[in-house]
């Protein structure tokens, strides 16, 4: 009886495409407050504000071109924040890396910032090269709610039973 084996290494999960001359893969680390956004991924029916759409629009502002791809290590849901979302885009635009970061941060809303930018090999893939994810869930455990934490923590006004 034939046996199948599944190998979850990067090489089997991501098949690099043919290297394209002149194409630049730009890796970015993005931080954002997702309260005003409907998640990472573009949504067109109906169109709503997303992190991906904001980055693409800002990139078009600074290069007058659309990137070939914008890929994130993961996707966040509506209202979710990120401190270190790694993503990459592919472009032929001959713009300096420091101008990409400065330009994106100039045109992005104040709730999104590009923290790091670097040019990487075309075989890097934000999703498949990712080796881990870290999530933080915050609970405000006190009687009264806090206006400072209303969108950043789950308010639990009663005593928590941590024994269960």
Residue ranges and their predicted role:
Residues 7-8:
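Intrinsic-disorder-associated, low-complexity terminal segments enriched in Asp/Asn/His/Tyr and depleted
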Residues 2, 11-164:
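Structured-RNA-binding interfaces characteristic of tRNA pseudouridine synthases
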